[in-house]
């Protein structure tokens, strides 16, 4: 009787141990490399696709002759400083098995071409995605919302061509910008683009919470920032895949890093950590789940002796353990879109 009782106790303990093993926290699971793995979507376990995007702003005179921003990429020292900042952040990301989606525009591209700087070509050769960041007023002027789809398309094509010249990449699919132009998706499709994200109202510096989440969709149309119906309505035949940024709970999540709301770089990355964990909770098995955030050249530099340490710390303490456990997987924006397209079939 005693022996039977012991055996039963052992069986119960083993059963509990097995059940607990299913929910071992990601940070406690054994580390394993996941660098350069193909994007997968195992129906048995939700996976969150992750990357860091980079917006290169239009600082100086653009290819269309519009003066924009503070600073000027036509000044060699200013341009080189930003080149070094971009390289520093991309190298940090590479060291953790990731690749970024680099979003460029003139005059950064034109200066790179004119000066013979190969930074975009070098980054493309190392696996980073080349894409377009389109500040419409810097390329179309102040009345951009009144212009035709063809005018938008022509200028977007011009900017894409400059990215191709600077990087050697011909397959440019992703763009950010043009957010308040109702016909932006028609213009983007005309320009050969099919992946979009980073929607923020440039006037309010906010993102409607209707746009947040982890699952991509195909918007049936654009928005003026007031009427959100077409944007939030999924069209199975829509030409563009929209990638939400994650399960954020603040409408100013995209701009708070440059405001007093976050308090500090460290506080902002603590907010990112909580948002990433919330996105993991929202992720669904068998669906494409995404989370990403954006940086700019020189942003979050912090201590000159340890530049961009807050980014490195976030990757070491938050992202790396989740990649090792299989909960998170690195993927550039077009790879996220392709993973979503694969689930549509």
Model segments located where?
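Well-ordered, non-membrane alpha-helical segments in soluble/globular domains
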Residues: 76-89, 113-117, 149-159, 265-278, ...
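Short coil-to-beta-strand
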Residues: 45-54, 122-133, 239-245
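Active-site beta->alpha N-cap acidic-glycine motif
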Residues: 39-122, 289-293, 297-300, 306, ...
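Active-site-adjacent pocket scaffolds in enzyme catalytic domains
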Residues: 171-289
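Intrinsically disordered, low-complexity Ser/Thr/Pro-rich tracts
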Residues: 1-45, 188, 342-345
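Metal-dependent polysaccharide deacetylase catalytic core of the NodB/CE4 family, i.e.
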Residues: 96-182, 246-249, 290-299, 332-335, ...
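C-terminal domain-boundary segment and adjacent tail
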Residues: 196-203, 207-211, 263-345
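Short acidic/His/Gly/Ser-rich catalytic and metal-binding motifs that mark active-site loops
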Residues: 59-64, 139-142, 250-254, 302
């Amino acid at each position: 009787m005693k022996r039977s009782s012991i055996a039963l106790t052992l069986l119960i303990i083993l059963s509990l141990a097995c059940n607990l093993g299913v929910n071992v926290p990601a940070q406690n699971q054994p580390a394993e490399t996941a660098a350069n793995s193909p994007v997968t979507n195992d129906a048995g376990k939700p996976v969150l696709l992750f990357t860091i995007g980079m917006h290169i702003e239009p600082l100086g005179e653009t290819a269309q002759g519009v003066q924009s921003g503070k600073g000027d990429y036509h000044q060699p020292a200013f341009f080189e400083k930003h080149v070094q900042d971009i390289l520093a952040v991309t190298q940090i990301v590479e060291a953790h098995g990731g690749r970024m989606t680099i979003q460029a525009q003139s005059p950064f591209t034109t200066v790179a071409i004119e000066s013979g700087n190969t930074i975009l070509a070098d980054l493309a050769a190392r696996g980073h995605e080349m894409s377009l960041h389109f500040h419409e007023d810097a390329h179309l002027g102040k009345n951009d919302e009144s212009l035709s789809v063809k005018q938008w398309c022509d200028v977007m094509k011009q900017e894409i061509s400059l990215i191709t010249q600077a990087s050697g990449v011909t397959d440019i699919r992703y763009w950010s910008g043009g957010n308040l132009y109702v016909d932006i998706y028609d213009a983007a499709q005309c320009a050969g683009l099919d992946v979009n994200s980073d929607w923020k109202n440039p006037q309010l510096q906010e993102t409607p919470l209707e746009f947040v989440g982890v699952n991509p969709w195909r918007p049936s149309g654009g928005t003026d920032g007031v009427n959100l119906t077409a944007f939030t309505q999924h069209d199975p035949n829509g030409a563009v895949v929209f990638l939400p940024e994650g399960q954020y709970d603040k409408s100013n999540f995209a701009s708070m890093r440059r405001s007093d709301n976050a308090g500090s770089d460290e506080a902002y990355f603590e907010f990112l950590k909580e948002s990433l964990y919330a996105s993991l909770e929202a992720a669904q098995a068998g669906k494409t789940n995404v989370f990403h955030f954006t940086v700019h050249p020189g942003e979050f530099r912090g201590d000159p002796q340890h530049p961009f340490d807050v980014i490195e710390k976030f990757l070491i303490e938050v992202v790396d353990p989740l990649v090792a456990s299989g909960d998170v997987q690195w993927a550039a924006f077009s790879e996220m879109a392709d993973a979503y397209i694969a689930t549509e079939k």
